[in-house]
């Protein structure tokens, strides 16, 4: 069984948890309007995805 033999110190616990980081979102430019967008998503500015308009932007 996975039972700890000794108490885990604060330093050891914090060293282990130091790897828990949030990554910045990867951004690419939209080929239609050249605004930054998340890849494989519909562009929030123009509504285009994969070379065609899928959302009507007013």
Swiss-Prot record:
A GO term for molecular function: structural constituent of ribosome
Top-level division of the source organism's lineage: Bacteria
Any GO CC annotation of this UniProt entry: large ribosomal subunit
InterPro entries: Ribosomal_bL32 (IPR002677), Ribosomal_bL32_bact (IPR044957), Ribosomal_zn-bd (IPR011332)
UniProtKB keywords: Ribonucleoprotein, Ribosomal protein
KW Ribosomal protein (keyword) present: yes
Residues making up the signal peptide according to the UniProt record: none
Coiled-coil features, chain-numbered ranges: none
Gene Ontology biological process terms from the UniProt entry: translation
Recorded family membership: Belongs to the bacterial ribosomal protein bL32 family.
Protein name from the UniProt record: Large ribosomal subunit protein bL32
